[in-house]
Amino acid sequence: MKLSRRSFMKANAVAAAAAAAGLSVPGVARAVVGQQEAIKWDKAPCRFCGTGCGVLVGTQQGRVVACQGDPDAPVNRGLNCIKGYFLPKIMYGKDRLTQPMLRMKDGSYHKDGEFTPVSWEQAFDVMEEKFKTSLKEKGPEAIGMFGSGQWTIWEGYAAAKLFKAGFRSNNIDPNARHCMASAVVGFMRTFGMDEPMGCYDDIEQADAFVLWGSNMAEMHPILWSRITNRRLSDPNVKVAVLSTFQHRSFELADNGIVFTPQSDLVILNYIANYIIQNNAVNQDFFTKHVNLRKGATDIGYGLRPTHPLEKAAKNPGSDASEPMSFDEYKAFVAEYTLDKTAEMSGVPKDQLEQLAQLYADPNKRVISYWTMGFNQHTRGVWANNLVYNLHLLTGKISQPGCGPFSLTGQPSACGTAREVGTFSHRLPADMVVTNEKHRDICEKHWQIPAGTIPAKVGLHAVAQDRALKDGKLNVYWVMCNNNMQAGPNINEDRMPGWRDPRNFIIVSDPYPTVSALSADLILPTAMWVEKEGAYGNAERRTQFWRQQIKAPGEAKSDLWQLVQFSRRFKTEEVWPEALLAQKPELRGKTLYDVLFATPAVSKFPLSELKEDQLNDESRELGFYLQKGLFEEYAWFGRGHGHDLAPFDDYHNARGLRWPVVEGKETQWRYSEGNDPYVEAGEGYKFYGKPDGKAVIFALPFEPAAESPDNEYDLWLSTGRVLEHWHTGSMTRRVPELHHAFPEAVVFIHPLDAKARDLRRGDKVKVSSRRGEVISIVETRGRNRPPQGLVYMPFFDTAQLVNNLTLDATDPLSKETDFKKCAVKLAKV
C-alpha cells in the first residue's frame, strides 16, 4: 500500500487519538487510504456531541466501513476524537433492532406480554387505537412525546408540527430539557435571543479561557485540542478551570479551582464585585448597551407542590424582576467579599483573585465556557445570567476572542431542540406558545385554523414523568433518546408511570435500550447516514448530510415514522368543530395531507435528487420531503436575525453559521461590522430586546435542594467519560470503546475510602433516599474528587446511577440538577 504524505498524516492522527485513550485502531481505519478507489466517500457531521465535527464517511457494499476527520471541515480540521474514529461501528451492534416489537400475550397486545415481532401495519394499528382512545376520552393533554437533541432538524420540525398543530398538544419536550434548557432561558432573559454570540474562531484569538463546570478535555476534546494549541503556543495565554472535582482539564490549567457544590453562584458575584471595586467596568459599553434588573428570589426547586421545599418557597417558579440602579447593584454584589467567598466556596483567596483579575484586565480577551456544571443546576439559569454579567460589565462580548459561550452536548440540541422549538413552551425561531402573535404567525404559515395551537405550555420532561405516574398522560412516544436510564430519579415517577396499565409507551430506537425494554412497543429506527439529515451545532453552524446507505431490515427513520403515522388521523378526529368551521376545505383530509403533503412542502420534485441518490422517505412519497420541510421551517427565522441559508447551499458547504444574510454567515452577533442586523454607528445592538440592550441581573446565592447530612454524608455528582456518550447505547456496542471503560466506577477521595474501610476495586453499595446501585471503588485515575464528594458516570446499564439522583429542577428552565444530591457508601 502506497501512502501519500496527506494520507500518512491522516492515518497517524487516527493512531495518535487512539493511543491517547489507550485503544487499538481498527484495521479498517488503518487501511482506509489504500482502499480509496473501492470506498465511496461523502461528508457528514459526527453523530455524537454538539461540537459538530465534520467527518468523511466511507461506504462500501451498502455498509459504513470507514470514517476519517474531514480536512475541509472548519470545526475539527481533519481531526476526530476517539469516538469519532469508531463511528462506523456504532451502527452494527449485534442486537440492532430491525422490526417492530410489541408486548403480546395470546396473540394480542398485553401490558405484561413478551416482546413479539410485528409488522409496521400492526404496530401503527395499535398506536392509532391508543392515540384515538386517549384523544376522545381525555383530549390532547393525555398524549405526549419525548424527543431529542439528536433528531435531525426536519425530524424535530415534523414532530413539533404533528403534536402542536396536528394533535393540538404541547406535551412534546426534548431530552435537551435535561442539558440545555437553563442555557436557553439564560440567553432569553439576558439577550432576548437564544444561542451564543461568538464562535469557535474565538479560540485562536483569546488571551484567557475560563471553564465553569465543563470538562472539555473529555466532553469536547476537539475544541480542547484547539485550546491546548492556543495555550501552548503563547506563554501569556491563561486557562482557569472550575469544578467540584479535579478532572483531565485541570492538567492544562494555570488556575485549577475546586469549589464546594452550589458555591459557583458566590464566586460569580464575587468577580462582579471585584470588577466594580477595581474600576474595571467598561463605562462606555455599560452605559450604552446594558440595563440592570433585580430578580425574584426564593423560587423553589421544581419539585412536586406538596414537597416541603416547594411549600416553604416564597416565590416558587417566579421569573419576575424589577429595574435597579447601578448603585443598588453595586451594593448587592458588595456583600460577596473575598473573605466570604473563600469561606463559602472553599477556594483559596489567591486563586479567587487570580480568576477575577482575568475578567477585570481590560487588555485580556476572555472566553467563558460551560456545559452541564452550570446548566444541570437548581439555579442554572441564574448561573448563566451571572456569567453574562461579567462580560457585560467589562464589554468583553461579541468581539473576536472574547465572550460567554454555552457548549452543547448533543449534535443538534441547538439546531433542532432549540431553533426548531421542540420544547413544550416553544415554537420555531425563539417564538413561544403563550404568545398569541407567535401562534398566529405559525397558524397562518401552516395554513391551519386560528386557535389550533394551544396557548397552554405543555408538560416538560420531569412533569411528563409525574403525569404518567398520576395517570394523566396515557400515550407517550419516546424518540431518539434513552430517558429511562438518563432521566433523574428513575423509581419515583418514571418507571411506575411507564409500567402503569393505564399507559401505553412507544420507544423508537435502533437498539434495545433500558427505555426500549421498559416500553410496550419498540419501533426500529434508522441511524445517522441511513437517512438524509441536518444538525445545528453549538456555534450556530447548520450542517447537512445525504443518505449514504439503507437501514437494516425494516428500520425506518424517525421522520418516516412521524409522517406515515400522521396518515392515520383525519382532521375531524383531532380538531373540534369550531376549528373545522373556519376551514371546511380541510374536512376529510388526513393530518398528512394538512401538515406534510401541502403545496409548500411537496413543491420540490424528486428530479432535484440525483438519480442514484438514496432518500427513502422522499422516493416513497414522490417529492423531496426534507427540502420542503426545511424551507417551510426556515421561513420563520428569515428577516429577524435567525436567517438560515437556502437548502441547497448546505449540501455544498461544510456548514454555515446563522444568521446567513445574502450568502454570508455570521461569526459574531450583536456587534457592528460583524452582524448584518447591527447598523453602522450602533456599535452593539442586542436586538432580541426591544430597546437593544442586554440585561445584568442581581441574583443571590441559594442552597442546593439536597446536601449531605449525618446519614447521607457525601455529595454525588454524575456525568460522562471520554469513551462513552451519554447512556452508552451506541458506544458500548463498539468493542474497543467498551473494553477501554467496560463498567462504571465510583471515583472517591482515598481518605474517604479509607474511612469507610474501602479499597480500590472493592464492590460498594451507593445509596440515596431514592435508591441504590452496586458499583466499584476507584481512588485513582482521571477524576479526583475532594473529600466529601463522589463522581459516577451514567453510561452503565448495570449501574443505573439515576436510581440515586433527585428530580429537583431549576424552577425557571425545568432542567434537572444531576450534579448535587446526597449519598452514602457501604462495603459489599
Swiss-Prot record:
The record's subcellular location field reads: Periplasm
Give the EC number. 1.9.6.1
Q: Which residues bind substrate?
A: 794
Note the SMART domains from the entry: Molybdop_Fe4S4
Question: What are the record's GO terms for cellular component?
Answer: membrane; nitrate reductase complex; periplasmic space
Q: What post-translational events are described?
A: Predicted to be exported by the Tat system. The position of the signal peptide cleavage has not been experimentally proven.
What span is annotated as the signal peptide, if there is one?
Answer: 1-31
Q: Does the keyword Signal apply?
A: yes
Q: Where does [4Fe-4S] cluster bind?
A: 46, 49, 53, 81
What GO molecular functions are on record for this protein? 4 iron, 4 sulfur cluster binding; electron transfer activity; iron ion binding; molybdenum ion binding; molybdopterin cofactor binding; nitrate reductase (cytochrome) activity
Q: Source organism's superkingdom?
A: Bacteria
Paste the cofactor note: Binds 1 [4Fe-4S] cluster.
What EC class does the entry list?
oxidoreductase
Q: Which SUPFAM superfamilies match?
A: ADC-like, Formate dehydrogenase/DMSO reductase, domains 1-3
What GO terms in the biological process aspect are recorded for it?
Answer: cellular respiration; Mo-molybdopterin cofactor biosynthetic process; nitrate assimilation
| Listed PROSITE patterns | 4FE4S_MOW_BIS_MGD, MOLYBDOPTERIN_PROK_1, TAT
The cofactor required is: [4Fe-4S] cluster; Mo-bis(molybdopterin guanine dinucleotide)
Predominant location: periplasm
Give the catalysed reaction(s), semicolon-separated: 2 Fe(II)-[cytochrome] + nitrate + 2 H(+) = 2 Fe(III)-[cytochrome] + nitrite + H2O
Q: How does it assemble?
A: Component of the periplasmic nitrate reductase NapAB complex composed of NapA and NapB.
Q: What does this protein do?
A: Catalytic subunit of the periplasmic nitrate reductase complex NapAB. Receives electrons from NapB and catalyzes the reduction of nitrate to nitrite.
Which NCBIfam families would you find in this protein's record?
Answer: NAPA, PRK13532.1, TAT_signal_seq
The family line of this record is:
Belongs to the prokaryotic molybdopterin-containing oxidoreductase family. NasA/NapA/NarB subfamily.
Q: What is this protein called?
A: Periplasmic nitrate reductase
Source organism (scientific name): Salmonella gallinarum (strain 287/91 / NCTC 13346)
Q: What is the lineage of its organism?
A: Bacteria, Pseudomonadati, Pseudomonadota, Gammaproteobacteria, Enterobacterales
**Gene that encodes it:** napA
